[in-house]
Amino acid sequence: LHDSGLVDVLRQVGQPLLGVCLGMQLLFERSAEDGGTECLGLLAGEVVPIPPAPGVRVPHMGWNTLTTVREDPLTTGLPDGTRAYFVHSFAVPVTADTLQTTEYSGVWSAVVRHGNRWGAQFHPERSTSAGSRLLTNFLLEVSP
């Protein structure tokens, strides 16, 4: 994306954007994956590995609960305790753009927003009604 000039286009375009799982991670400035990778830089922060801990498997594959940090139209109908399905080995620490968190060997951003750029670390397509709600909220928020 950098070589083709698309990163600059994405930074300048005003169209709403929703990144899911790796797509959310790509919204940030940098990832520790593969020894360090520059990402899109649309949101401030770095993607880091989920640290090993007793009883914690990496990659994280399974259902976890969401906890609201701040309200947003994207998370309407997704109260604290809502369960969502995650598959990831890297995660985004809580930032000023975090809307909801999840806990797995630490507390991580589960849903983020900065302007018209949103991200969900979990998989809406696997998260049944919670995933449908998030996608519906996104479409309602960005529809004219």
Task: Identify the meaning behind each predicted range.
Residues 65-126:
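Active-site oxyanion/phosphate-handling segment shared across diverse enzymes
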Residues 7-11, 75, 135:
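Short amphipathic alpha-helical segments and helix-helix/interface helices
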